[in-house]
């Protein structure tokens, strides 16, 4: 094309193969390997230990990449698989974290013409069901706040996160952990969702943010009718258990949800947590 007003010339490349609109995602793929996240998923998650199909690493990494790409629903994962350039990068990356027999199976599938390089929405939904314990639903009482007990796979996810926190602390040591604790009201139109205090159906996860490291230390997904202060002591205790080595001082920041006598007394009693002393 001829040069216009600006000193720029445009050239049309007839070869469209390998183009991608997701050029930033491979950096996160590399980070996942460097941080040991891929290895942590493989060593801790056991959803797909037995059986054919997508491995734990493939599904979890696909979901992470989907969130980074701006996906808002499981169905959006199809957009990743439709990006030819990204798929080529993903295929090469997948071979790096697979075991030998898994690598052979995947290469054999590609030779046979298998097109999918990311799990389908159906496969992802089937995978996510493993983190739901239907038996826990029998414990619900209408009109009361209820938090299901995490099943085995949810506990395994926590161990994956623990490994990532250890990596961050090793690269950027912090002796202080200021834990910002607050709930986030997330509106939803899901039929089974419950109403929040704001008057609409929502979910209200309780999050613990590690201010010095700039990341989520702990989170608990909750129904919309569960108050932020409900069992806040237990959540903070679980967050403390995730702190990696090297942390010597802990502070907790909260809104009125944290103004509970039991909670405040526990933080002030250094005998309850001698490794950190009084928690401010």
What are these regions (language model features)?
Residues 1-201, 207-225, 233-245:
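Dynamic "connector" segments at or just before major functional cores
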Residues 214, 221-280:
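An internal, acidic/charged active-site-proximal segment
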């Amino acid at each position: 094309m001829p040069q216009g007003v600006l000193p720029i010339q445009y050239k049309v490349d007839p070869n469209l193969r390998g183009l991608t609109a997701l050029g930033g995602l491979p950096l996160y793929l590399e980070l996942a390997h460097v941080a040991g996240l891929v290895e942590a998923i493989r060593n801790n998650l056991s959803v797909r230990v037995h059986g054919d199909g997508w491995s734990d690493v493939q599904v979890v990494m696909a979901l992470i990449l989907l969130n980074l790409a701006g996906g808002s629903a499981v169905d959006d994962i199809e957009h990743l698989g439709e990006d030819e350039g990204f798929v080529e990068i993903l295929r090469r990356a997948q071979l790096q974290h697979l075991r030998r027999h898994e690598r052979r199976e995947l290469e054999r599938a590609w030779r046979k013409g298998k097109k999918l390089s990311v799990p389908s929405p159906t496969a992802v939904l089937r995978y996510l069901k493993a983190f739901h314990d239907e038996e826990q639903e029998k414990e619900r009482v209408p009109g009361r706040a209820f938090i299901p007990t995490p099943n085995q796979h949810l506990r395994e996810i926590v161990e994956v996160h623990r490994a990532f926190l250890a990596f961050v602390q090793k690269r950027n040591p912090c002796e202080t952990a200021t834990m910002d604790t607050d709930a986030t009201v997330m509106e939803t139109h899901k039929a089974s969702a419950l109403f929040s205090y704001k008057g609409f159906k929502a979910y209200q996860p309780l999050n613990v943010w590690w201010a010095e490291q700039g990341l989520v230390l702990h989170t608990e997904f909750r129904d919309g009718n569960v108050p932020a202060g409900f069992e806040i002591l237990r959540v903070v205790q679980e967050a403390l258990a995730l702190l990696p080595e090297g942390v010597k001082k802990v502070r907790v920041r909260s809104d009125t949800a944290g103004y509970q006598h039991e909670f405040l007394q526990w933080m002030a009693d250094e005998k309850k947590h001698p490794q950190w002393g009084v928690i401010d």
